[in-house]
Swiss-Prot record:
Recorded family membership: Belongs to the PRA-PH family.
Keyword set, alphabetical order: Amino-acid biosynthesis, ATP-binding, Cytoplasm, Histidine biosynthesis, Hydrolase, Nucleotide-binding
Protein name, entry field: Phosphoribosyl-ATP pyrophosphatase
Pathways per UniProt: Amino-acid biosynthesis; L-histidine biosynthesis; L-histidine from 5-phospho-alpha-D-ribose 1-diphosphate: step 2/9
Catalytic function, reaction form: 1-(5-phospho-beta-D-ribosyl)-ATP + H2O = 1-(5-phospho-beta-D-ribosyl)-5'-AMP + diphosphate + H(+)
Main location: cytoplasm
GO MF term list: ATP binding; phosphoribosyl-ATP diphosphatase activity
Protein's cellular compartments: Cytoplasm
Top-level EC class: hydrolase
SUPFAM superfamilies from the UniProt entry: all-alpha NTP pyrophosphatases
Length: 115
C-alpha cells in the first residue's frame, strides 16, 4: 500500500509535469499539451466523460465486488481534473489545503459554511 507521503509526492510530481506541458509541451507529442492547446471546453468534456465512466465502473463494482476498473477510471478522472486545475492556474495543493481545512468540520457544518 502507498503511504501518504508517496501520494503527496506523486501528486506534486504530476502537478509539475502538467504545468511544464502547459507551458512548453508540444501538442503533437504530448496528450496533456494537446488538451491545453484545445482549451477548457475540451478538458471539461474529458472530465465529464471520465466522471461518467467512473460512475458506471462503480455500479459494476457494486455488482461484481471487483474494484479494479473503478480504480482505473477514478485515476483517469483525477488525472483529467488535475489537467483542468492546471489549465486554470491551480493545482492539487489548493485542493489538499481545502480538504485539510474541512477535516475538523463535520460534513453538515462544512456544507452550512458554504451558504
Amino acid at each position: 500500500m502507498t503511504s501518504t507521503l508517496d501520494v503527496s509526492k506523486v501528486l506534486g510530481l504530476l502537478d509539475q509535469v502538467l504545468a511544464e506541458r502547459k507551458a512548453s509541451g508540444d501538442p503533437e507529442a504530448s496528450y496533456v499539451a494537446q488538451l491545453h492547446h484545445k482549451g477548457l471546453n475540451k478538458i471539461l468534456e474529458k472530465v465529464g466523460e471520465e466522471a461518467t465512466e467512473t460512475i458506471l465502473a462503480a455500479k459494476d463494482a457494486e455488482r461484481s465486488g471487483n474494484t479494479d476498473l473503478l480504480v482505473c477510471e477514478t485515476a483517469d478522472l483525477l488525472f483529467h481534473a488535475m489537467v483542468m486545475l492546471s489549465h486554470l492556474g491551480s493545482n492539487t495543493d489548493a485542493v489538499m489545503a481545502e480538504l485539510a481545512r474541512r477535516f475538523d468540520l463535520s460534513g453538515l457544518e462544512e456544507k452550512a459554511s458554504r451558504k
